[in-house]
Amino acid sequence: FRLSKYREKLIDMITANPTMVQPKERRAMILKQLEDENMDDLCVSRTAFDWGIPMPDGFDKNHVMYVWFDALTNYLSGVNGLDQSDENPLKHFWPADCHIIGKDIIRFHSIYWPAMLMSADLPVPKSSFSHGFVSASDGRKMSKSFGNVIDPHEMLDKYPVDGFRFYLCSEAIYGS
């Protein structure tokens, strides 16, 4: 995938639209990556995995689709976004008003995904907001693989759902 072809256009779009990548610290980080780094083209297949979506017939059978190249398209296919006809009841869901994403995947959502959409001549999401992680008492991010998560179902057995939502929204620091 010719990611390099969209570098300047991405810089121009993000510069012209301050809300395209938020918060401002993440926007600055993405712009710095676009301006300072060599934007290599992106290989859409991988050989290091024995799992994944196979490449179409005619490609090397040892290759599978690069997971991010495939996964990002789910946003569009989930709302039947390629069909912009009046008959598509979901057409008003694309482009997305805002993608809310974790800070560890902002590059994929703020560089790769918009470039993929531009290559297909499709509108890009209006904005992406990158949030931080919920941290455990030791300061590490909460993660199932670390085994330090809180079971939300246990919390809902103790507290009303609206109270729990309010707590999470009011105490979380977006962008941290």
Name each model-derived stretch:
Residues 1-176:
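Structured secondary-structure scaffolds
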